[in-house]
């Protein structure tokens, strides 16, 4: 079967969304009743949708979110105790546009990482670049980058992402070169980008997790000063969910 010349042109121009819509409309007898303007409007709408979906898929892939979490699922999960007003504010996402930070704290297994990933997913849908990383792994990778001479490049890339999710703050001591790395990240992001941190330790104990008090003061000033704080409590999700849904 020969292709319609218009379909060939759409494909040659890389207008995949319009090409797909053209094929479906051409196969639909009811489309004969549409005016030229209505045809064009439908094709353009499908192209815009296709491009938006493609960009979203790319942002989600680059975000490397640890959990397939979305904010719409929050109310369907096991009961949690938290400030709903703060959670609604975080989901709305204005804090990211204002380059503010977020701290989510609570006991192990409460679902902090899952919630952070849900907020990350929403940020991707809001056209923000996102990156999820566990803090112990991040600090280790920065030490390795220093060893091969790519530390500056790595720090620059971390400074560019619009929402950086640092999971498991304080799980391991922040010592050696780690305080310097963390300060460099936050200094470059403060007032320019947003950082979301999760921790099983209350914010009041974050200072003691950093070996150098001077660095600790500087780090927390940039991290906590403009942060929205969400404290979670409740039963561990590890006791409530099957292994495939284990949370941290």
UniProtKB/Swiss-Prot annotation:
CDD domains: AAA. ATP binds at residues 106-113. GO terms for biological process: DNA replication. It comes from the Bacteria. Gene3D superfamilies: P-loop containing nucleotide triphosphate hydrolases. GO terms for molecular function: ATP binding; ATP hydrolysis activity. Pfam families: IstB_IS21. Keywords: ATP-binding, Nucleotide-binding, Plasmid, Transposable element. Disulfide bonds: none annotated. SUPFAM superfamilies: P-loop containing nucleoside triphosphate hydrolases. InterPro entries: AAA+_ATPase, DNAC/IstB-like, IstB, IstB_ATP-bd, P-loop_NTPase. PANTHER family: ATP-BINDING PROTEIN RV3427C IN INSERTION SEQUENCE-RELATED (PTHR30050:SF4), CHROMOSOMAL REPLICATION INITIATOR PROTEIN DNAA (PTHR30050). NCBIfam families: IS21_help_AAA. Belongs to the IS21/IS1162 putative ATP-binding protein family. This is Putative insertion sequence ATP-binding protein y4uH. It comes from Sinorhizobium fredii (strain NBRC 101917 / NGR234).
């Amino acid at each position: 079967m020969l292709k319609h010349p218009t379909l060939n042109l759409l494909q040659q121009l890389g207008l995949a969304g319009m090409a797909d819509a053209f094929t479906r409309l051409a196969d639909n007898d009811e489309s004969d009743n549409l005016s030229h303007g209505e045809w064009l409007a439908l094709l353009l709408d499908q192209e815009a949708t296709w491009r938006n979906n493609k960009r979203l898929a790319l942002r989600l892939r680059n975000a490397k979110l640890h959990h397939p979490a979305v904010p719409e699922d929050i109310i369907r999960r096991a009961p949690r105790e938290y400030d709903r007003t703060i959670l609604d504010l975080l989901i709305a996402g204005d804090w990211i546009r204002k380059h503010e930070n977020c701290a989510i704290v609570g006991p192990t297994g409460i679902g902090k990482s899952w919630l952070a990933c849900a907020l990350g997913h929403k940020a991707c849908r809001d056209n923000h670049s996102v990156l999820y990383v566990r803090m112990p792994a991040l600090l280790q990778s920065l030490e390795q980058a220093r060893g091969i001479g790519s530390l500056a490049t790595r720090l620059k890339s971390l400074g560019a992402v619009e929402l950086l999710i640092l999971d498991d703050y304080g799980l391991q001591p922040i010592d050696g070169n780690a305080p310097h790395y963390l300060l460099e990240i936050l200094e470059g992001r403060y007032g320019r980008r947003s950082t979301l941190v999760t921790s099983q330790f209350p914010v009041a104990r974050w200072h003691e997790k950093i070996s150098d008090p001077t660095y600790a003061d500087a780090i927390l000033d940039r991290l906590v000063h403009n942060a929205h704080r969400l404290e979670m409590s409740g039963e561990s999700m590890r006791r409530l969910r099957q292994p495939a849904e284990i949370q941290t």
